[in-house]
Curated annotation (Swiss-Prot):
Domain of life according to the entry: Bacteria
Subcellular location: Cytoplasm
Keywords: Cytoplasm, Ribosome biogenesis
Entry protein name: Ribosome maturation factor RimP
Gene of this entry: rimP
């Protein structure tokens, strides 16, 4: 089974578990690292997810995966269920919507105004662009970024 098929299968299995508890899925990864396979499921809820809640979801998902025949993941793997963390990636539209007003890090495919990386407060989100309020030494300014230029974005911790 391809990694994308595993992600799709796991997403379909975990969503009802999360919905029952008013949690939401932020990401699913199935990756090979250092000779081992890892199935990572990132979950959250308003106010933040707890370790006990991650354990509960892990056990429920593991039970569902074990009950499937044929096994959707024939190779051995480690199942990890966790919070996406303080610097969580912004991958979906809802991630960006929830990040309005938050400090974020944006990496671009190509330079914009001589830079490929911007950090600032997400001020405005439009379908084709976003606006960051950026601090540059002693001044603040709004930087408009075309969303097609964005290679990756994540929440960031402001220092």
């Amino acid at each position: 089974m391809s990694t994308q098929s595993v992600v799709e299968t796991v997403t379909a299995l975990v969503k009802p578990i999360l919905d029952d508890h008013h949690f939401y899925l932020t990401d699913v990864e199935f990756v090979k690292e250092g000779g081992g396979w890892y199935l990572r499921v990132y979950i959250d809820k308003t106010g933040g997810i707890t370790l006990d809640e991650c354990v509960m979801v892990s056990e429920a998902l593991s039970e569902k995966l074990d009950a499937m025949d044929p096994d959707p993941i024939p190779q051995q793997y480690f199942l990890e269920v966790s919070s996406p963390g303080a610097e969580r990636p912004l991958k979906h539209e809802t991630d960006y919507e929830q990040a309005v007003g938050d400090y974020i890090h944006v990496s671009l495919f190509k330079k914009l105004d001589g830079k490929k990386v911007f950090e600032g407060t997400l001020k405005e989100l439009l379908p084709d662009q976003l606006t960051l309020t950026v601090k540059d030494k002693s001044r603040k300014f709004d930087q408009v970024i075309d969303r097609q230029l964005i290679a990756s974005a994540r929440l960031a911790i402001e220092f």
